[in-house]
């Protein structure tokens, strides 16, 4: 069977909620990274046979944001586009969907990734269509309602993160220690220039005509400590252990890849960054959200005849610190192999883009280390898990 290779990968810096990227729409962020990925790959928009971009909350963004992004990236009208929503797994699922298309010989060159501007997600008035008639009306925050709330249990994702911490006996201190590690490692990686390979600067003109350049992740906290983290109150559950400190922020950002069939890359003389060897997905009861990536990883390893010891590096999205620590209990991986340059707690979690970010961070780190096998895994709302296996030569 044919194999898919990653030829290029680029992402924006991740901005804080209402931060440096608040005036840049999701499709604009997507256009920036798609254009950069094409330039890195040395192919034009005319060469692309399709694109798939993940985006979770599309309300108010206009029709098919992925096609808007593709046009901004210079792709012609003839290139078809899809916008995909698998909650936090959207950016990773966009890649695996394109992998399936390439392996099925439906395409040879595709662009995949994810984007989200959580700062630009609107509020909605549910009764506005037909009228509230009498009494107060509701102003609904679509970022929370469509992006961060379980549609089945009607609770914030943090509640399910708390459930996992209790079930798997993960202490508040362990979660805070992981959060501190995430910030420390991300700060060190940033200082050493490790994110320069993946980050493309965002240039934009502010409302007052002032040019702005954003080239660094905004959310890394260099000054945090265990004492500071320990003082934070639990969120969404008074007896819980999830806090604003051991959970990621609300962020803006995008990431994209150029994917090719192995044969097409060879024909064009392209040296791949990585080869996609397989992927897996899993679904669980909604409250078991944090465990889903762990079971997806185990399923992926079994499917490919591998053990956890065969994998050189893991990237597990830090939807909460409890997610990584729950997966450690399920998979049994060495935590020293996980999120070695920090994770979403420090870098940010723009929900539609995070799956793309963890995969490219994994690939570039394996490349720096001279190659190896890596797994990127992520949970998503309603307790689904996605995992991807890559090899860097």
UniProtKB/Swiss-Prot annotation:
- Give the Gene Ontology MF terms in alphabetical order: acetyl-CoA C-acetyltransferase activity
Q: Which Pfam families match?
A: Thiolase_C (PF02803), Thiolase_N (PF00108)
A GO BP entry is: sporulation resulting in formation of a cellular spore
Q: What inducers act on this gene?
A: Subject to catabolite repression.
Provide the protein name. Answer: Acetyl-CoA acetyltransferase
Question: Under which EC number(s) is this enzyme classified?
Answer: 2.3.1.9
Write down the species: Bacillus subtilis (strain 168)
- Name the family: Belongs to the thiolase-like superfamily. Thiolase family.
Recorded hits in InterPro entries, A to Z, give: Thiolase, Thiolase-like, Thiolase_acyl_enz_int_AS, Thiolase_AS, Thiolase_C, Thiolase_CS, Thiolase_N
Enzymatic reactions: 2 acetyl-CoA = acetoacetyl-CoA + CoA
Q: Does the keyword Nucleotidyltransferase apply?
A: no
**Keyword check for Kinase:** no
Instruction: Quote the catalytic residue positions.
Output: 88 (acyl-thioester intermediate), 349 (proton acceptor), 379 (proton acceptor)
Question: What are the entry keywords?
Answer: Acyltransferase, Cytoplasm, Sporulation, Transferase
Q: What class of enzyme is it?
A: transferase
Q: Which cellular component terms (GO) are annotated to the entry?
A: cytoplasm
Compartment(s) where it occurs, according to its Swiss-Prot or TrEMBL record = Cytoplasm
């Amino acid at each position: 069977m044919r194999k898919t290779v990653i030829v290029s990968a680029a992402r924006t810096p991740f901005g804080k909620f209402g931060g440096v990227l608040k005036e840049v729409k999701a499709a604009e962020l997507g256009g920036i990274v798609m254009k950069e990925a094409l330039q890195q790959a040395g192919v034009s928009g005319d060469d692309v046979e399709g694109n798939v971009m993940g985006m979770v909350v599309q309300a108010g963004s206009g029709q098919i944001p992925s096609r808007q992004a593709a046009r901004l990236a210079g792709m012609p009208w003839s290139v078809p586009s899809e916008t995909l929503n698998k909650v936090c797994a959207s950016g990773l699922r966009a890649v695996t969907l394109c992998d399936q298309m390439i392996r099925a010989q439906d395409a040879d060159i595709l662009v995949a990734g994810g984007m989200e501007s959580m700062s630009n997600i609107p509020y909605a008035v549910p009764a506005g269509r037909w009228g509230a008639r009498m009494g107060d009306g509701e102003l609904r925050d679509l970022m929370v309602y469509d992006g961060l709330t379980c549609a089945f249990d009607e609770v914030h994702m943090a509640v399910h993160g708390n459930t996992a911490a209790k079930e798997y006996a993960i202490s508040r201190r362990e979660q805070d220690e992981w959060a501190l590690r995430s910030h420390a490692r991300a700060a060190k990686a940033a200082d050493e220039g490790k994110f320069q390979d993946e980050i493309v600067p965002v240039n934009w003109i502010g409302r007052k005509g002032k040019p702005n350049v954003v080239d660094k992740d905004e959310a890394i906290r260099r000054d945090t400590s265990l004492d500071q983290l320990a003082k934070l109150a639990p969120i969404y559950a008074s007896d819980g252990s999830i806090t604003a400190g051991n959970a990621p922020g609300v962020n803006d950002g995008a990431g994209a890849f150029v994917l090719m069939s192995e044969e097409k890359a060879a024909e064009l003389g392209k040296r791949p960054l990585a080869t996609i060897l397989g992927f897996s997905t899993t679904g669980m009861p909604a409250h078991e959200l944090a465990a889903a990536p762990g079971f997806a990883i185990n399923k992926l390893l079994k499917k490919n005849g591998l053990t956890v010891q065969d994998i050189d590096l893991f990237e597990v999205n830090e939807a909460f610190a409890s997610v990584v620590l729950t997966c450690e209990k399920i998979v049994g991986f060495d935590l020293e192999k996980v999120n070695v340059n920090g994770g979403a707690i420090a870098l940010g979690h723009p929900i539609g883009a995070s799956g793309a970010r963890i995969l490219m961070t994994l690939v570039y780190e394996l490349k720096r280390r001279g190659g190896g096998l890596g797994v990127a895994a992520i949970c998503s709302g309603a307790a689904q898990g996605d995992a991807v296996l890559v090899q860097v030569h």
